[in-house]
Regions:
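Short, well-ordered beta-strand segments in beta-rich or mixed alpha/beta enzyme
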Residues: 5-8, 38-64
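An amphipathic, aromatic/His-enriched active-site/gating alpha helix that lines ligand/cofactor pockets
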Residues: 56-81
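A short linear hydrophobic-aromatic micro-motif
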Residues: 34-40, 74
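Short S/T/G/P-rich N-terminal loop/turn motif that feeds into the first structured element of a domain
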Residues: 1-31, 43, 81-95
């Protein structure tokens, strides 16, 4: 399943709020059967917080973010060195 990066604003002085947002993101994803919250990354210097969701579409990831009250700035498809790659020949996942 593709991963999506949800970009949000989180002030440097509010860094402690990230854990609360993580829990809201996790709960919102659990309400949507095809979405999974993976983790978040806070960049205090830039006052940005990124939430990673696995979802079948950008729309589903954005819906989870909105339900969590994350107020997304943008939602983009993301690739990671941890993202499984599917071998089309036999359908097995490889890293």
């Amino acid at each position: 399943m593709p991963s999506y990066l949800v970009e949000t604003y989180l002030a440097r002085r509010c860094a402690g709020e990230r854990a609360v947002r993580d829990e809201r993101a996790r709960s919102a994803a659990e309400e949507l059967t095809r979405v999974r919250f993976e983790h978040s990354i806070h960049v205090p210097e830039d006052e940005m917080c990124f939430f990673v969701f696995d979802a079948p579409s950008r729309r589903d990831a954005a819906l989870a973010a909105r339900r969590a009250g994350l107020d997304p700035i943008r939602v983009v498809k993301a690739l990671s060195s941890c993202t499984p790659i599917t071998d089309n020949a036999n359908g097995e996942e490889q890293r």
